[in-house]
Amino acid sequence: MSFTKIEQKLKEFTIDAGRYPSINTNEQLKELEMNIGNQLPSDYKDFLKKYGGCYLESKKTTDEIEYDVCYKPLEKDPWMGKGDDTQLLEGFYGLANDHNSLQKAIDTYSDRFPRNIIPIASSAGGNEICMDIDNGKILFWDHELSHPDKDFFLIANSFEEFVFSLVDEPIEADKEDDGILYIELDDDLLSS
């Protein structure tokens, strides 16, 4: 599938991307691939060139209902509830040398990830969305686990498949957030 189809899918969302006209994306990608010792998939490279480090926002959000951009993974991770079929996407890392720097994210996790796995985006709770650069698969990394062979869960078989799994998900209000203050009293307090 061509990058054009990925671009079409991404038009479903508002893309908040930092613009850095002084960045030579081809040079940055060349340096990045040299650092990781492998080629990135072409659709992911095209994504980095066009959007860089970015956040996706739902176009469905209204005054009444707020939406998050989520993905539907192939394999559930420990952070998903029993009835959940989506997980939150926070933001993608990019080529600029800023807080969304892909190279900085790779460096940060180099001692926790196998050599062939790099972070490409952040997920809720300090978890990461990663790419296995040997096969292009997209994985969820659970930051609370400490067994490299068990810390990763399959999201998608390719970057393209990952992008096509993105959906708008309404943010559920807390069930107890009904404007009523609940107070629990200990029985010992009541008997004194």
From Swiss-Prot:
Q: Which SUPFAM superfamilies match?
A: SMI1/KNR4-like
- This protein is called SPbeta prophage-derived uncharacterized protein YokK
Q: Which InterPro entries match?
A: Knr4/Smi1-like_dom, Knr4/Smi1-like_sf
**Which branch of life, at top level?**
Bacteria
The record, for Pfam families, names: SUKH_6 (PF14568)
Which organism was this protein described from? Answer: Bacillus subtilis (strain 168)
Gene name of this polypeptide:
yokK
